[in-house]
UniProtKB/Swiss-Prot annotation:
Record keyword Isomerase present: yes
Protein name listed in UniProt: Triosephosphate isomerase
Pathway of action: Carbohydrate biosynthesis; gluconeogenesis; Carbohydrate degradation; glycolysis; D-glyceraldehyde 3-phosphate from glycerone phosphate: step 1/1
Gene Ontology cellular-component annotations: cytosol
Record carries keyword Lyase: no
UniProt keyword terms in alphabetical order: Gluconeogenesis, Glycolysis, Isomerase
CDD domains: TIM
Length: 248
């Protein structure tokens, strides 16, 4: 099954009005293949700024997080309805930095994922192992556990993109080899086929999210189960366009 190549750009807690304008303007003027979907995730305070600047139908805007309640006394949180209200269509959930620094458990991520999907946004669901877990050779057990928590709450995966992000590679400059990533992605797809169906598994896009950049993105070009990238630091730089075009 042909899956549309997907590039996500997670700006994290970086950027200003000026720098985000520069990034969006660069995308507005870039050559983007028609068969590529691009989603950028600026900080929440700049979501409507990015939406207003964006001129490309291939480019959508995402939040980096959302709470699992519609409204209420949850100081500092953003609801899915608020995210939709400013024009964003996606949300990143389960990112390792949320799991690590903000103590988000598999259960919390699953609840957020179900609530976001039920509320009408699409989800980039992040999973991945730490260095310690990698050294213990339990990568597959970890990602399957993380997926299983969501599978218990979400049956329809039409609007879910999975991002495999080896935590040991994020922001370190280290990266899994294309071959290693392909092996993990294939195992993830087989797990989804077992738990859902072959058709669903073959339709779900699985991204690589560990220090992808303009130089190493092309090495993943012929990997059948690598359907794109969730890019961190490189999404703030001109090389983000190179990553978008890495399958051309």
């Amino acid at each position: 099954m042909a899956r549309t190549f997907f590039i996500g750009g997670n700006f994290k807690m970086n950027g200003s009005k000026a720098s985000i304008k520069e990034i969006v303007d660069r995308l507005n003027g870039a050559s983007i293949p028609s068969n590529v979907e691009v989603v950028i995730a600026p900080p929440a305070i700049y979501l409507d700024h990015a939406v207003a600047l964006n001129k490309r139908k291939e480019v959508k805007i995402s939040a980096q997080n959302a709470y699992s309640k519609a409204s209420g006394a949850y100081t500092g949180e953003n609801s899915v309805e608020q995210i939709k209200d400013v024009g964003a269509e996606w949300v990143i959930l389960g990112h390792s930095e949320r799991r690590t620094y903000f103590n988000e458990t598999d259960e919390i991520v699953a609840e957020k994922t179900k609530f976001a999907l039920d509320s009408g946004v699409k989800v980039i669901l992040c999973i991945g192992e730490t260095l310690e877990e990698k050294q213990q050779n339990i990568t597959l057990q970890v990602v399957q556990r993380q997926l299983q928590a969501v599978l218990e709450k979400v049956q329809d995966w039409t609007n879910v993109v999975v991002a495999y992000e080896p935590v040991w590679a994020i922001g370190t400059g280290l990266a899994a080899t294309a071959e290693d990533a392909q092996d993990i992605h294939h195992s993830i797809r087989e797990f989804l086929a077992e738990k859902l169906s072959r058709d669903v598994a073959d339709s779900v896009r699985i991204l690589y999210g560990g220090s992808a950049n303009g130089k190493n993105a092309v090495t993943f070009k012929d990997k059948a189960d690598v359907d794109g990238f969730l890019v961190g630091g490189a999404s703030l730089k001109p090389e983000f366009v190179d990553i978008i075009n890495s399958r051309v």
